[in-house]
């Protein structure tokens, strides 16, 4: 029997016009948007799905990084997420957003993925303006148009 996340993922794939996408054996589904933004969906349980935006590896050579990340996380928390977290296996910074499955639709999922993408864009720009660059071979700061952002953006 398919989980609610699996059924939603099938409808989402149909809505955006791609073939089939599915969760792997670890209950993750990853894909790229515009070959820049890497998103992972986690079939966490039957109550909610997690949406992760993979931002990149932690820079180890910048002393202001931890303070900027804490400041960013506070701002995201004040605006309802997504939240910054660390994935130890990949040594990467992620943006994480909990997506409740009650009354979920492909449109709502797409909107929340867009929230994560917009938040990734803005996080990159704010960190870039502070002289901090996350190591991410896919996201190029020059491809993001408005580089004069001074505040974090939750996309909602």
Curated annotation (Swiss-Prot):
Protein localization: Cytoplasm
Gene3D superfamilies to which the protein is assigned, alphabetical: 1.10.287.390, 3.30.1460.10
GO biological process: protein secretion by the type III secretion system
One GO location term (cellular component): cytoplasm
Record keyword Repeat present: no
Entry keywords, A to Z: Chaperone, Cytoplasm, Virulence
Effect of residue 75 to E: Abolishes Tir binding
Known outcome of mutating residue 74 to E: Abolishes Tir binding
Chaperone among keywords: yes
Entry similarity comment: Belongs to the CesT/SycH chaperone family.
Subunit structure of this chain's protein: Homodimer.
Function summary: Chaperone for the type III secretion of Tir. Probably stabilizes the protein, prevents inappropriate protein-proteininteractions and aids in secretion.
Protein name: Tir chaperone
Encoding gene, per UniProt annotation: cesT
């Amino acid at each position: 029997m398919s989980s609610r996340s699996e059924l939603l993922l099938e409808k989402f794939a149909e809505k955006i016009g791609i073939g089939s996408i599915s969760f792997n054996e670890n209950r993750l589904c990853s894909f790229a948007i515009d070959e820049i933004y890497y998103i992972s969906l986690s079939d966490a349980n039957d109550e909610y799905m997690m949406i992760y935006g993979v931002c990149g590896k932690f820079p180890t050579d910048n002393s202001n990084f931890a303070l900027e990340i804490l400041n960013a996380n506070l701002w995201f928390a004040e605006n309802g997420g997504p939240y910054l977290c660390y994935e130890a296996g990949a040594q990467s910074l992620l943006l994480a957003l909990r997506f409740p499955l009650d009354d979920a639709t492909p449109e709502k999922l797409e909107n929340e993925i867009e929230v994560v993408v917009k938040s990734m864009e803005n996080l990159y720009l704010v960190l870039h303006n502070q002289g901090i660059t996350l190591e991410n071979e896919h996201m190029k700061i020059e491809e993001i148009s408005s580089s004069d952002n001074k505040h974090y953006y939750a996309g909602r």
